């Protein structure tokens, strides 16, 4: 039996950690839809049990996207973990595990800008989330935000000025622009397909494409605005940042860090994966930070195995 397990659950599946110094001991590719997050997660846990039939632990912490907003029953998930792995369980958000992986019990703001976007801070016995509202209402600066803005900008530039460089690059990846309105109306273009266009925008920016440079600069700025607001709300100067946009785009990262510097915030890259934060929370349910998370409804702990 393993003492503790940390499970990181994202939109594409889950990763399992048993040692902070080692890579994931298991990876389950099992997409988690927003509509069926709880059922998809439980199915992924069953897949993990089949892949690792001898896996057991005294306590598991699972950090998942959508914990707070998608109607997931923490009690149902903890019951499955107890049944499958014989373990006590802590269920929380991946924003909490990302924060804990970097800051532990220290104070600061974790900003993750990937397919989605959010800032989460803890300081002075206060917790604050900014954004993380999904593609329809938020995710400012995210890969999806970049991809959609690029599609809109590409069509607009082509129609108004005849500049088709960005449009041609996007069409090469996602098909003719003339088909986009119909595909959006039929919901045939997924959030992940739109988000994947951010990589093309980043590539074009490196070759000097002006539209791409402007989009990525704005992405960094709006992401930084979330960080600044979050830091101000809890009263901290420390920011950790990560995610595919900030780590993969020099232009977005540059504008992000410039805004933070203008507000005298100290920034450092998030190094440890969220799953390590989950592992550390599993091991630390008696410490004051984890007790605070539970008291604020940011984590659910079922201590009856």
Describe each region flagged by the PLM.
Residues 1-57, 102-109, 151-305:
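ATP-binding/phosphotransfer module of carbohydrate and carboxylate kinases, centering on a glycine-rich
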Residues 56-58, 87-88:
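Short acidic capping loops at alpha-helix termini that bridge into adjacent secondary structure
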Residues 61:
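FAD-binding subdomain of flavoenzyme oxidoreductases
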Residues 64, 68-164, 298-305:
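Phosphate-binding/catalytic loop of phosphoryl-transfer enzymes
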């Amino acid at each position: 039996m393993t003492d503790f397990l940390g499970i990181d659950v994202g939109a594409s599946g889950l990763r399992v950690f048993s040692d902070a110094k080692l890579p994931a001991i298991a990876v389950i590719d099992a997409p988690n839809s927003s509509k069926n997050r709880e059922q998809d997660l439980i199915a992924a846990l069953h897949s993990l049990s089949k892949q690792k039939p001898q896996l057991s632990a005294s306590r598991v912490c699972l950090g998942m996207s959508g914990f707070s907003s998608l109607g997931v029953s923490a009690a149902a998930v903890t019951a499955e973990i107890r049944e499958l792995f014989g373990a006590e369980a802590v269920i929380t958000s991946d924003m909490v595990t990302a924060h804990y992986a970097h800051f532990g019990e220290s104070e600061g703001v974790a900003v993750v800008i990937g397919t989605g976007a959010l800032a989460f801070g803890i300081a002075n016995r206060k917790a604050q989330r900014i954004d993380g509202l999904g593609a329809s209402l938020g995710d400012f600066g995210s890969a999806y935000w970049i991809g959609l803005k690029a599609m809109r900008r590409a069509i607009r530039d082509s129609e108004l000025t005849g500049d088709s460089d960005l449009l041609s690059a996007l069409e090469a990846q996602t098909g003719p622009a003339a088909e986009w309105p119909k595909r959006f109306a039929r919901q045939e273009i997924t959030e992940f397909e739109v988000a994947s266009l951010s990589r093309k925008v980043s590539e074009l920016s490196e070759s000097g494409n002006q539209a791409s440079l402007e989009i990525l600069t704005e992405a960094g700025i709006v992401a930084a605005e979330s960080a600044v607001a979050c830091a101000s709300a809890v009263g901290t100067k420390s920011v950790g940042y990560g995610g595919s946009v900030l780590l993969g785009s020099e232009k977005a990262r540059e504008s992000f860090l410039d805004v933070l510097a203008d507000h005298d915030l100290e920034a450092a890259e998030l190094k440890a994966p969220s799953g390590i934060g989950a592992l550390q929370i599993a091991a630390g349910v008696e410490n004051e930070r984890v007790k605070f998370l539970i008291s604020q409804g940011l984590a659910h702990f079922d201590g009856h195995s």
